[in-house]
Amino acid sequence: VQGTEYIATKDVKFDNSIDYQNGVAIPNQYVANFRIAPAKSVLMCIEGGSAGRKIGILDQEVCFGNKLCCFAPYTDISEYIFYYLQSPLFFEIFSSNKNGIIGGVSVNNLKQLFIPLPPLNEINRIVNKIKAISKSIEG
């Protein structure tokens, strides 16, 4: 089927990769009926045992499922958002907002959470430092 790839929670991996080749695509004539995440946005699982732990940056535009949330910044700060959403500070705030039987955070509650945004040059410095440290750890 030609169309836009559909990403579900199972397609966002714990290693931060996203499986686009899952065999599910939304035909072009139906894409408008789905939630769409643009390329370079961040998808995060917000429900169940993987909530707040499965997260990745998209390489392409996708349709996505109910248990995922899309963070689509207006400027090129996706990597900063990606790293912030994995920080102990955010995870603590996220975890304290979980509720329900399966443990999740609603999109409405996420919209109320504060994401600190320093000046762009500081954002770039933070991202570059995290990348350098990660690279030296991976070795």
Regions found by a protein language model. Give the residues of each.
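A generic structural signal for residues embedded in beta-strands
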Residues: 44-45
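Glycine- and charge-enriched low-complexity intrinsically disordered segments
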Residues: 80-89
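Sequence-specific dsDNA recognition surfaces
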Residues: 5, 9-39, 59
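Short, charged beta-turn/beta-strand-edge "cap" motif at the junction between a beta-strand
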Residues: 48-52
